[in-house]
């Protein structure tokens, strides 16, 4: 990186060329250092097949460079032009209903189609060759938001053939596929790979093993589609040019873990107050997106699209309050962003996103948004220059697995049980206490964490069980939850013993029965008796989650082997049996939470874990903040930057030691204004 810090997504092709110098001048005055361009400009760069026109983009890059602004170029594969669709209609995607998704939006492409891939290779090669020596170009973005418009996943003939080849490579023989998928059920056996279709709409249900492999295949397909482009670019441009992609938080169409292996770093698109929401994201929801994306590469990242104003397609969302736009940008930095690029520079006059407002309004005349973002950039730029490469440090990790999410998306087990929802619930419990969290892969080195939370480890194998066991034996505290060890990796139910299957020895329990609660709730009480679920009158709580100690959605009926109970159910026919357990193993402990905890139960569990392991808040003894105020930090070479973020619309009193030096923000008389922030040197 070269300290870019702040930028904007710029579409010069949307405006008369005589306007470009004015835009560049206004960007410089604002403090912008980088723009992203061209990711939706295929027709402008190739108005007809084989005829390339990059001269307009040369001029735009040069105008910006003269004002000290460098450019990131996006490959345009997210929006093939109309002339291509007319010549090759089969490059359009086909949904599970067999209907072709047509031209007129974006991502109207099949990423497996060989004809389309050839066009992509040609345009990417032409761009790389043309811009490789341009001093104004510093990096490349591949495509745009993989998966954003591909939720149905293309099921055309090309994808069918590619899926069959993928299966043949994975299973070698059709007999192995039949075994892995359990095709004996409903007479689904195959005699040849050519008989296997994508999981199209059927009269009655679908094979969960087939659907899981389909999701795996499509993730691999997207990664391969991206790698075709990254390989071309790397073979042509200087090694100093970076390659990235703008991801979308917990979107799971493609594994960002796999995708990131071909990138220099990842980017994230953050819209806390999207038009599709009735209110802005809660602060913990912003935090979990940012920490989740940082966990993809275990490194600082960029925000390639940071909300700058009102968003909208057919309808528009609410206007962010004064101070929220800067606060959200600083929040991104606090969680690991080295550069923040605002979407977009100027509100577009036409097209689907004409109501997706930018730094400049439709008129192009700078207003309050421009001024507010300008104050932010002036305030934060000196800090961010010094902070580049610094990372948040965490003692707690949450395991995130794309395959676990896919499997539970196929079979949630009970209504509203969602894999990512569970990750976020555990994250929030630590976030509320200002305890930082990292997100990790299942096979990552866990030894640096005091606590590792692994929700819904639905698919399991012996390697995963051994990995977790080694972590615990070496002194770690592992938390597994309901539905752990239910299935093998092929999505067939585990049959070699009671649940939690391969985790039984580690956890010191068995689960031979369970109660799929759905919307019901079961009271829970502490085994020690120091905490219980009774109100002031001594009556047990009603069977709603509320603020009581309750189990919801699911109740594993646990039999203790070597484990000890921590919380017991206090109702239903299994009253008195454990809901939460702990098992000592080696130098560490393995905890099991056999339900979805209510908020109060979750808080009690996290308090217990923090006390047991000595896990500390960022606040420590030198900073005390009220509810609604977040404290987090980044560290580098022994230096620490502390961020205090007021996510409320009220002024907040902050108690801090005088040993801290205020670097930026508006902390005055130990008070933070509504939606205010402060960065301290600690």
Region spans (language model):
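Short, acidic/polar
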Residues: 15-29, 120-126, 248-259, 321-329
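Conserved, mostly hydrophobic/aromatic
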Residues: 8, 27, 35, 64, ...
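Short, solvent-exposed turn/loop segments enriched in Gly/Ser/Thr/Pro and often Arg
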Residues: 11-13, 38-41, 74-83, 138-147, ...
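Carbohydrate-binding surfaces of carbohydrate-active enzymes
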Residues: 193-197, 227, 239-240, 260-264, ...
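Polysaccharide-binding and catalytic clefts of secreted carbohydrate-active enzymes
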Residues: 97-288
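The substrate-binding groove and active-site-proximal loops of carbohydrate-active enzymes
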Residues: 6-17, 40-55, 102-121, 146-150, ...
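An acidic-aromatic substrate-binding cleft motif
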Residues: 1-19, 26, 30-33
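Aromatic-lined substrate-binding rim segments of carbohydrate-active enzymes
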Residues: 22-28, 36-100, 128, 229-237, ...
């Amino acid at each position: 990186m070269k300290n870019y810090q702040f930028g904007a997504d710029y579409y010069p092709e949307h405006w008369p060329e005589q306007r470009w110098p004015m835009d560049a001048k206004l960007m410089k005055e604002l403090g912008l250092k980088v723009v992203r361009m061209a990711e939706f400009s295929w027709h402008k760069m190739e108005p007809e097949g084989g005829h390339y026109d990059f001269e307009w983009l040369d001029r735009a890059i040069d105008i910006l460079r003269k004002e000290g602004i460098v450019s990131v170029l996006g490959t345009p594969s997210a929006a093939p032009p109309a002339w291509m669709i007319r010549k090759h209609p089969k490059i359009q995607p086909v949904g599970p209903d067999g209907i072709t998704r047509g031209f007129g939006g974006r991502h109207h492409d099949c990423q497996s189609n060989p004809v389309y891939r050839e066009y992509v290779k040609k345009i990417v090669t032409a761009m790389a060759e043309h811009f490789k020596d341009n001093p104004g170009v510093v990096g490349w973005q591949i495509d745009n938001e993989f998966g954003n418009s591909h939720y149905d996943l293309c099921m055309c003939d090309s994808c069918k053939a590619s899926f069959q080849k993928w299966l043949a490579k994975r299973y070698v023989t059709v007999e192995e596929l039949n075994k892995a998928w359990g095709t004996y059920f409903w007479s689904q056996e195959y005699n040849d790979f050519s008989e296997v279709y994508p999981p199209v709409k059927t009269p009655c249900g679908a094979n969960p093993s087939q659907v899981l492999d389909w999701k795996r295949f499509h993730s691999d397909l997207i990664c391969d589609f991206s790698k075709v482009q990254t390989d071309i670019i790397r073979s042509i441009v200087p090694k100093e040019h970076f390659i990235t992609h703008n991801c979308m938080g917990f979107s799971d169409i493609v594994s960002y873990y796999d995708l990131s292996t071909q990138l220099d770093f990842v980017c994230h698109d953050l819209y806390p107050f999207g038009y599709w929401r009735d209110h802005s994201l809660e602060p913990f929801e912003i935090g979990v997106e940012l920490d989740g994306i940082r966990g993809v590469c275990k490194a600082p990242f960029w925000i390639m699209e940071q909300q700058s104003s009102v968003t909208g397609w057919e309808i528009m969302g609410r206007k962010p309050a004064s101070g929220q736009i800067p606060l959200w940008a600083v929040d991104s930095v606090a969680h690991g962003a080295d550069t923040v690029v605002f979407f977009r520079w100027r509100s577009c006059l036409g097209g689907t996103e004409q109501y997706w407002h930018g730094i400049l309004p439709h008129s192009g005349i700078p207003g309050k948004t421009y001024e507010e973002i300008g104050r932010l950039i002036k305030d934060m730029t000196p800090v961010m220059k010094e902070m580049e490469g610094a990372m948040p440090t965490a003692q707690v990790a949450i395991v995130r697995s794309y395959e676990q999410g896919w499997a539970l998306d196929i079979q949630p087990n009970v209504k509203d049980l969602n894999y990512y929802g569970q990750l976020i619930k555990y994250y929030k419990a630590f976030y509320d206490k200002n305890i930082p969290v990292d997100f990790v892969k299942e096979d990552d080195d866990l030894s640096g964490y005091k606590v590792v939370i692994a929700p819904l480890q639905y698919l399991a194998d012996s390697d995963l069980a051994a990995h977790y066991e080694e972590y615990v034996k070496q002194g770690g505290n592992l938390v597994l939850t309901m539905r752990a060890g239910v299935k093998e990796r092929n999505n067939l139910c585990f049959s070699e013993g009671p649940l939690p299957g391969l985790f039984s020895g580690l956890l010191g329990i068995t689960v031979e029965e369970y109660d799929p609660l759905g919307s019901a709730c079961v009271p829970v009480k502490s085994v020690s008796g120091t905490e219980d679920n009774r109100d002031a009158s001594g009556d047990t709580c009603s069977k709603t989650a509320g603020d009581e100690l309750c189990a919801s959605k699911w109740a594993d009926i646990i039999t203790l082997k070597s484990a000890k109970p921590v919380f017991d159910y206090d109702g239903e026919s299994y009253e008195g049996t454990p809901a939460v357990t702990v098992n000592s193993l080696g130098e560490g402990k393995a905890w099991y939470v056999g339900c979805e905890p209510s908020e109060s139960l979750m808080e009690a569990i996290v308090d217990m874990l923090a006390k047991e392991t000595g896990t500390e808040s960022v606040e420590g003894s030198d900073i005390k903040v009220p509810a609604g105020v977040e404290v987090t930090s980044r560290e580098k070479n022994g230096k620490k930057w502390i961020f205090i973020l007021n996510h409320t619309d009220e002024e907040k009193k902050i108690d801090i030691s005088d040993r801290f030096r205020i670097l930026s923000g508006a902390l005055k008389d130990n008070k933070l204004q509504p939606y205010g922030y402060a960065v301290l040197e600690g």
